[in-house]
C-alpha cells in the first residue's frame, strides 16, 4: 500500500518472474507507476513485502535498488544535459585515479574505453563520446540511457515508456536495442500504452486494474483485443484495440 498526496493505492498479491521481457499495461491510475516506484526504491510500501531474486528486499532509496542490480530508464531519461556521453554513463560511478581528502582525480581514459565497450555491447554507435548529451537527438539520448542501464543493471532493467517521445526511425532503433538485451538474457520490465510494441518486444503482459495485477498472459496466446478487455474489464467486443495503440 502506498500513500501519495492523500491518495491510497494498493498492490496486492502480485509477482513477476525473471529471465523474461515483461510489459506492464493498464489505464491511468491502475497502479503501474506505483508498482514501478516500489521496486525501484522511489517509494516504500506501508505494508507487505517485496521479494527480488528470491530474497526479501527493503529498498529505502533508488540507490539501494541500483546496488541490488535494478536500473531504471525513466521517461525524462535522468541524464545530465551539460555532461558528455562518458560522464553520463559513469554518473555516480566514476573511476578515480586517487583521492586526496575531498579532492579526486578521475581516470577519464578508462571511463571512455569502458563506455565504448558498454555502447558496443548494446549495439549502439556514437561517434563522439565527448559531446554533451544536450546536443543529441531524442533517440540518441534514449540509447545512452539504455546503454547505461544495461551496463550496470544486469539483474533487471525497468523502462518507462521507452519510445513515447521518439519518431518512427528512432523508435525502431530503440526497439532493436531492447531486443538485443533479450539476446543477452537481461530481464526487462516495460511500462507502455503501445500494444503493437508490447506484442513485438515481450514474452508476457502483466495487466493492472484498480491497483492490482489481474492477469499475466503470454503474448503468444492472446490478441490485442484480449488484452484491452482485461485492461477495461469490458467484453473485448465492446472496445476496439485501436484505442490503445
Name each model feature, range by range.
Residues 1-7, 11:
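Single conserved hydrophobic/aromatic residue that forms the stacking wall/gate
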Residues 48-59, 64-68:
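Conserved ABC transporter NBD signature motif
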Residues 192-193:
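H-loop/switch region of ABC-family ATPase nucleotide-binding domains
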Amino acid at each position: 500500500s502506498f500513500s501519495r498526496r492523500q491518495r491510497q493505492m494498493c498492490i496486492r498479491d502480485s509477482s513477476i518472474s525473471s529471465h523474461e521481457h515483461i510489459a506492464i499495461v493498464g489505464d491511468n491510475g491502475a497502479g503501474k507507476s506505483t508498482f514501478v516506484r516500489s521496486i525501484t526504491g522511489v517509494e516504500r510500501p506501508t505494508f507487505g513485502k517485496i521479494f527480488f531474486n528470491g530474497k526479501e528486499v527493503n529498498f529505502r532509496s533508488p540507490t539501494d535498488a541500483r546496488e541490488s542490480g535494478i536500473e531504471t530508464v525513466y521517461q525524462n531519461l535522468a541524464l545530465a544535459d551539460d555532461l558528455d556521453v562518458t560522464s553520463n554513463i559513469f554518473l555516480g560511478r566514476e573511476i578515480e585515479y586517487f583521492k586526496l581528502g575531498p579532492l579526486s582525480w578521475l581516470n577519464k581514459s578508462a571511463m571512455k574505453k569502458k563506455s565504448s565497450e558498454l555502447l558496443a555491447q548494446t549495439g549502439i554507435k556514437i561517434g563522439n563520446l565527448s559531446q554533451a548529451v544536450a546536443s543529441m537527438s531524442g533517440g540518441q539520448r534514449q540509447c545512452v540511457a539504455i546503454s547505461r542501464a544495461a551496463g550496470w543493471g544486469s539483474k533487471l532493467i525497468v523502462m518507462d515508456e521507452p519510445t513515447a517521445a521518439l519518431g518512427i526511425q528512432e523508435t525502431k532503433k530503440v526497439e532493436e536495442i531492447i531486443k538485443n538485451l533479450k539476446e543477452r538474457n537481461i530481464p526487462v520490465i516495460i511500462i507502455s500504452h503501445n500494444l503493437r510494441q508490447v506484442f513485438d518486444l515481450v514474452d508476457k503482459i502483466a495487466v493492472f486494474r484498480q491497483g492490482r495485477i489481474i492477469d499475466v498472459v503470454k503474448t503468444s496466446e492472446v490478441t490485442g483485443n484480449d488484452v484491452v478487455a482485461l485492461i477495461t474489464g469490458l467484453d473485448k467486443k465492446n472496445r476496439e484495440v485501436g484505442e490503445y495503440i
